[in-house]
Amino acid sequence: MNARTTFAADTKKTFSRPLLGIMISLSLSTSLYAAQAETMVVSADGGSGAEAESAWGPAPTVAAKRSATGTKTDTPIEKNPQSVSVVTREEMEMRNVTSVKGAFNYTPGVLTGNRGSSDVIDALSIRGFSETNTNQYMDGLKLQGDNYSEFAIDPYFLERAELLRGPVSVLYGKSNPGGVVSLVSKRPTQETLREVQFQMGNDNLFSTGFDFGGALDDDGVYSYRLTGQARSQDAQQAMNKEKRYTIAPAFSWRPDDRTRVDLLTYFQNEPETGYYGWLPRQGTVVPITRADGSQYKLPTNFDEGEQSNKISRTTKM
């Protein structure tokens, strides 16, 4: 009897106390929720805000959110079926990029330094595949060329540079299995744009450029963009110099909100493209040993070519 009475008393105590705590807790939380529900107010004031990002236009931040390279449509990057990297105009300016291959210096899966400091050709090795046969597209059109006849687009005239990794023959036809490069040029803008730049630096660097744009009428039906640049610099190697003169006029016609026609042009003259070569490890990284046992290294401005070994290039699009 005593054992049974003790058991019953203990059971009541251990059961009733937690139940009371649960009831009080539920009551308090319900009251707090009701109070919060009564006082929580969310309001939004409509405004102009930032212009919606387009896969063919400038990105509002360093990191782009949309791309057309993986689908050929204006698609969010996270919904692209393949790996896509986008280097925006803002990022190129932050890093002072002077070549397309330089834009991808920090892009995973890409080797850009296998030609040293030479920017004569935008040699890219994507996922280990050939650096000289990487397909490049500009505004959706393929840049035909190979080896010394390849295009070298100045990044100052680009809005974004995109890299699509992996086989893409379904979208782009015959292409390098490593991937393709897609370039988007600067487009006419309805907003007034006035930019002039000057740059001077080592190796007799001198560069000047301008970027103008805006609407040609009050309704914004017609707009333009005029971008130009002149650049000259001595190469590290003797007997070499880089000279480049580029201009890109563009015109846009927007008869309504759903129709836009762009006329994009690009003219570039390079009387001298600079140094295109490389030196062996022996004599640069490690010294060369003479017959008498002494050692030496090649000078930093050594050029293994001849005075006549120069490349000039003219680009018209």
List PLM regions with ranges:
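Cleavable N-terminal targeting peptides that direct proteins into the secretory/outer-membrane pathway or into
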Residues: 1-38
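Extracytoplasmic beta-strand/coil segments of soluble accessory domains associated
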Residues: 62-84, 89, 101, 105-141, ...
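Transmembrane beta-barrel architecture of outer-membrane proteins
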Residues: 87, 95, 121, 145, ...
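Short, glycine-/polar-rich solvent-exposed loops and beta-turns at beta-strand/coil boundaries
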Residues: 98, 104-120, 149, 154, ...
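Transmembrane beta-barrel outer-membrane domains
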Residues: 117, 151, 201-205, 240-244, ...
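Short acidic/polar hinge/loop motifs at secondary-structure boundaries
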Residues: 123, 141-165, 183-185
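Outer-membrane beta-barrel translocator/receptor signature
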Residues: 156-159, 170-247, 253-260
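Acidic/polar loop-and-plug regions of large Gram-negative outer-membrane beta-barrel proteins
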Residues: 231-235, 247-254, 258-317
